[in-house]
Amino acid sequence: MEEKKRELIRNLIAEGYIKRKEVAEAMMKVPRELFVPEELRHMAYEDTPLPIGAGQTISAPHMVAYMVEAAELRRGDKVLEVGTGSGYHAAVMAELVGPEGHVYTIERIPELAERARERLKALGYNNVTVLVGDGSKGYPPAAPYDKIIVTAAAKRVPEALLKQLKVGGIMVIPVEEEPGYQVLYKIIKTPEGYVIKKLLPVAFVPLIEEE
């Protein structure tokens, strides 16, 4: 497993998905095989998304690397993640923000949230809080956030999330620009407003927003 993991990370560096050594180290530390169903563990270090139940997936490693690089996560950051899924992405971010940082992650499917919570706790990630709810509304009690990462595609960028981002903060979010076509946005909040960079076409499950 370790050898497969090292090979995957070497490939992600070679392909340009991983740029900072901190990201390589964080992904090296997190056991992705513990975040996928047992029958798929042998595929944990293939660069592919995998089903995790409840119609959801764990993102491909290259996408996790790409998103945390785009978000420019730093030690001490307070991060909001929308769409916990398996909890793998949160674990990688927890490694990057360190004990002085914190990751708040929201999942709307209670069984996935519970499983992620148990897994993260068992692995000693005390700097992650798993919440159940509608992630498109964010989590105001801990706002504002240095970084917000959304792992499901929105029809438009939720206003609540923009409000909960600090000035100087970064949000990385897939947006469905037209039916069947999603683009990953990097949004930087400035004192005047927002700077939006369109990064690349992506394919995520839809962000479910409760009315």
UniProtKB/Swiss-Prot annotation:
Its EC number is 2.1.1.77. It comes from the Archaea. It is found in: Cytoplasm. NCBIfam families: pimt, PRK00312.1, PRK13942.1. PANTHER family: PROTEIN-L-ISOASPARTATE O-METHYLTRANSFERASE (PTHR11579), PROTEIN-L-ISOASPARTATE(D-ASPARTATE) O-METHYLTRANSFERASE (PTHR11579:SF0). Catalyzes the methyl esterification of L-isoaspartyl residues in peptides and proteins that result from spontaneous decomposition of normal L-aspartyl and L-asparaginyl residues. It plays a role in the repair and/or degradation of damaged proteins. Belongs to the methyltransferase superfamily. L-isoaspartyl/D-aspartyl protein methyltransferase family. This is Protein-L-isoaspartate O-methyltransferase. The gene is pcm.
